[in-house]
Amino acid sequence: MEEVYKVVEGFYNQFEWEDIAKDLTPYKGIVFCGMGGSGIIGSFASKWLEHRSFNKPTFVVKDYTLPPFVDRDYLVFCISYSGNTEETLSNFEEAIGRGIKPLCITSNGKLMERAKEEGCEIYEVPKGFQPRYSLGFMLSKVLNLLGVDKDELEDAKENLKENLESLKQKGKEIANRIYGYIPVVYSTPLTAHIAERWKGQINENSKSPAYFTILPEMHHNEVMGWSNPELRNKFVYLLMFDEKDHHRVKLRVDITKKILEDFGVVPIMLKGEGNSYLARSLYLVHLADWVSVFLAELYGYDPVPVKTIERIKEELKKHA
């Protein structure tokens, strides 16, 4: 566990500003392709662009195929830490077939090999990590390519560094509250990508089921599941929000909290700290890292191995 803690502690050091910004003006929109620990990069970047009022569409592809309208007028990112993610490789080949040269974020593998063969731009990240422990390296590359301000990125990095000890402590406290229950993260539109990360980190590191859903949509269906106390009490509920959420969404967060409390459930409230949306988002992302590794320790699991995921990959290879 000590080695895992060391990697998690170094998260803030994965962020570095680089002068590599692309001119986004010529493009109709941006497409981010990736799966799992690499796929969350696209979700994060898309939401960050939306918050900056980027006036072109962004699409996150977590599948084998690109949307049919994507052509050479779109900027396409192919993100795979290992370079061997079959869905992302499929996206890459489809893009090449349409005359698109994707920007490739990877550490190695077939994606790097094919990108070199096709003359695509490659943005290499350090080898030797699990994809989920290299989010900062990959996200830093993508944000720099999208033109993040140097001050914004450096402030977010400093925010992580300054809050490291408090994040560890909060992570341990939340892990103790989650232990023995199935976590459900209720997020807002501005925090949905972070809730997705929480789910993935708890799944992979803690070897636990976990789920997330989004306000206000969940107010139109999921809330009725609370009516069944026998099932309701098997879960622990986390309410995630951002200070810049729509005022009606904030009201819905308050209403959700009150109704859960009326059912005798005390939700865990999750709000990022920081001077910018990026800083607050990364704060919550890093909190998930700590929660998930402490929860793994409580359950007696090594956070690193992902045997079932590896088994699926091996089964798929039999049908290549």
Swiss-Prot record:
Keywords: Carbohydrate metabolism, Isomerase. This is Bifunctional phosphoglucose/phosphomannose isomerase. Its EC number is 5.3.1.8, 5.3.1.9. It holds the Pfam family SIS. The keyword RNA-binding does not apply. Homodimer. The active site is at 204 (proton acceptor), 220 (proton donor), 313 (proton acceptor). NCBIfam families: G6PI_arch, PRK08674.1-2. Dual specificity isomerase that catalyzes the isomerization of both glucose-6-phosphate and mannose-6-phosphate to fructose-6-phosphate. One of its GO terms (biological process) is carbohydrate metabolic process.
